[in-house]
Amino acid sequence: MKVFVAICVLIGLASADYVVKNRHDMLAYRDECVKELAVPVDLVEKYQKWEYPNDAKTQCYIKCVFTKWGLFDVQSGFNVENIHQQLVGNHADHNEAFHASLAACVDKNEQGSNACEWAYRGATCLLKENLAQIQKSLAPKA
């Protein structure tokens, strides 16, 4: 039992560093990445519709946004704990099935892809499997 409590405390401490972002943060990160990468208007319009074509500019845009969110790091990849916390909020119960579905979308880049391709690969899976939850977490608050 003590081991279980210790593990729970460690998980809590590890995820305590992440601050859940809001819609304002998302819009700011999008704008920053569009400017940093000189993303053309036609692609920005697609991104606003949650459409992310598989091209180099979009891949690097995805990496940029997920990095700014604290959800992706070029050395270690996706942080599933942070993604889970972002989608369910700070005070939600930790749902193991949902966590496992998120973890299934990420890899350790065994393929040796560049960071942009790696981020895109994981993000497109996360979007495909969890779009409604992602949109809900970023919806304007009434």
Swiss-Prot record:
GO terms for molecular function: odorant binding. Disulfide bonds join 33-64, 60-116, 105-125. It is found in: Secreted. Gene3D superfamilies: Pheromone/general odorant binding protein domain. Residues 1-16 form the signal peptide. One of its GO terms (biological process) is olfactory behavior. Its main location: secreted. Expressed in larval chemosensory organ. Specifically expressed exclusively in a subset of chemosensory sensilla on the third antennal segment. Keywords: Disulfide bond, Olfaction, Secreted, Sensory transduction, Signal, Transport. GO terms for cellular component: endomembrane system; extracellular region; extracellular space. InterPro entries: PBP/GOBP, PBP_GOBP_sf. Belongs to the PBP/GOBP family. Present in the aqueous fluid surrounding olfactory sensory dendrites and are thought to aid in the capture and transport of hydrophobic odorants into and through this fluid. This is General odorant-binding protein 99a. It comes from Drosophila melanogaster (Fruit fly).
